[in-house]
Amino acid sequence: MTGKLKQISSSCCFGGYQNVMEHFSDVLNCKMKFGIYLPDCCVSKEPVSVPILFWLSGLTCTEENFIIKSGMQRFASKFKVIVVNPDTSPRGEDIPVGIDWDPNFGVAAGFYLDATEPKFAKNYKMYSYLVKEFVPLIFEEYKELIIKQSCGIFGHSMGGHGALTIGLKHPELFKSISVFAPICNPMKKTPNFGYKHLEAFLGPLEGENILQWEKYDSMTLASKYKGPKVEILFDQVGSKDPFLQDLLPNNLISVSNPNIVWNYQLRENYDHGYYFISTFIEEHFSFHTKFWGKEEKKK
């Protein structure tokens, strides 16, 4: 590695290592932490290159939640894949937070977009951070261990929104997409989250500003998608999800686009949390393997 990364912790897990790293982001103007799981084949005496998955977490999360709650390390080890998960927002004393309806607005709620409202525009650029800085940083720092052509993205809730919007805009980077209970149509007003977060970051949904909103609305992006044909695994919980009225999954899967195949799974009896994710995450790993090269490259 080049010295841009600082190791915060490292724990052996299923023969590999779950690391937490830190770096300074020039895009966000603050230090950022992320998790990275390296399976045993990447840390052996003769390491090999493997596929990579980028996970995006939901509202209120840090880089820690996914690491300690999802149980993903077992399956990253089984399927021989590196898993990387960034934080969900910029953080620090100099990072602006708060609006009239939420004094902590912004913390753990970056929505994977580039804010345009003056208060947030300098720091809240999670879209540019991920696409222009974080992914290239990971590819460079771990280049000897990664098969870049076998790269996927997945996420939950706000992170599912991020996985969809970023994945659909960048098929050249991400060859596979899967989501757990994503926010699907934030251009539509809902009671709790989505619309009002985009409004705080982007300004009113009117006039020429509509184009800014459309960049971060999965339903709009899916309807306009013209990239290579993509199958998306879409895991959605049923009536026990207290945020179903905010997620609007039916709005998204109603989009008919010949270049998108919705692999939609309705999981009744589960709620919106990590018990749901940990139950079905192995299926997501298995799904992504369909789109990867099968061989590992020896060093």
Q: Language-model segments: what does each one mean?
A:
Residues 2-299:
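Non-catalytic cap/lid and distal C-terminal segments of serine-dependent acyl enzymes
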